[in-house]
Amino acid sequence: MDSMNWSRLEQFGEWEFFGLHEIPGSPKNFHLVSKKEFRYQDMIASSDVMLSKIGYGVYAECLLNGTPLIYLPREDFAEYPVLAGAMEKSGTGYCLCREDYYNLNWDEALETVLSKGKSEPVSSCGAADCAAEIENIIRNRGHNSLLT
């Protein structure tokens, strides 16, 4: 990533970018943030779009917040096909080829996700959903006494 011409980031004049690591060239629209000061989850929730490698954490946070994800292929990651397939199926992701990423050819990806906007956030009440499902199973098996 050090070989990338990061100053070209300024070509995206309508966009402000922030990241956790310094980048060469000091583009005016890049802002370095600290994990100590900003939680990763809050950064995703307050972003219009996330540009990242795909993984369980970023996938889950993007779904929970309705934040579109522009991601890079991860053929070395066993779960990549499942996560990428889910992003494609939900319409909330955009796979950016490595060449376009490294050449900062992000126009199409940004325009595509911007035109779709944020999606409806996914419910994050998994514990309550699981408890309700367990109660349904107990009721359906006639063990109502276990619920009182």
Pin down the residues of each PLM region.
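General structural feature for long, well-ordered alpha-helical segments within catalytic domains
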Residues: 4-5, 9, 83, 126, ...
